[in-house]
């Protein structure tokens, strides 16, 4: 009799393990989303509708033998995972692969692909009507998003606010890399506000076209 492996989380790690064990174990993947999200392409999906369609991979096509339970894991104990008030899954092995969370649009917290797609479309349409956009954080994600925005919307004025005194302040980045990125940002007329922590969050949600001042 095959061992049952319950994997909690359907991100990169959880999906990789589930597919590798699918032929040799009774695999149950517990994940609230209806599709795997290729998060590395999320920022390109903000500006490109074709990429928006490519970042989602339905879980119902993931496993040949195992199954996917679209729900949250409510509790975990040795040999048992509770996913709802009336459903428990017995397990020989439990793997926690819950991953990390980042603000939209770097990652998506919504469980339904249709909801995320609508939000991406709304953001893209809002960007096309905007004159200026504010990005908070000059780390790798903020800088990548700045590059995507300035490439897709040349008319858009981009300002990056960063509380540290330089870009890419967290991490062992070479000074030459920082200088090269600063040059690219300047060539795209991106305004850097360094050493300037944001006093308060804007009064609108991320990706909503609405004038504000901070």
Residue ranges and their predicted role:
Residues 2-67, 144-175:
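Beta1-alpha1 glycine-rich phosphate/pyrophosphate-binding loop at the start
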Residues 2-4, 64-134:
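FAD-binding core/adjacent interface of flavoenzyme oxidoreductases
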Residues 10, 98-99, 214:
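Glycine-rich, N-terminal phosphate-binding loop of Rossmann-like dinucleotide-binding domains
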Residues 133-148:
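Short strand-loop-helix active-site module centered on a catalytic nucleophile
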């Amino acid at each position: 009799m095959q061992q049952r492996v319950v994997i909690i989380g359907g991100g990169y790690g959880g999906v990789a393990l589930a597919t590798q064990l699918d032929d040799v174990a009774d695999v149950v993947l517990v994940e609230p989303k209806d599709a795997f999200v290729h998060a590395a392409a999320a920022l390109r999906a903000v500006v490109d509708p074709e990429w928006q369609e490519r970042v989602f991979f339905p879980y119902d096509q993931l496993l040949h033998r195992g199954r996917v339970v679209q729900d949250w894991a409510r509790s975990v104990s040795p040999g048992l995972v509770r996913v709802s008030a009336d459903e428990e899954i017995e397990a020989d092995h439990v793997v926690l692969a819950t991953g990390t969370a980042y603000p939209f649009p770097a990652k998506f917290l919504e469980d339904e692909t249709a909801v995320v797609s609508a939000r991406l479309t709304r953001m893209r349409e809002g960007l096309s009507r905007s004159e200026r956009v504010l990005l908070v954080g000059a780390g790798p994600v903020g800088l990548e998003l700045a590059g995507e925005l300035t490439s897709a919307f040349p008319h858009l004025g981009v300002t990056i606010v960063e509380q540290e005194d330089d870009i890419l302040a967290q991490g062992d980045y070479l000074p030459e890399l920082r200088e090269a990125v600063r040059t690219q940002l300047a060539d795209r007329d991106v305004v850097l506000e360094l050493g300037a922590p944001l006093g308060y969050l804007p009064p609108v949600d991320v990706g909503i076209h609405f004038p504000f001042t901070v």
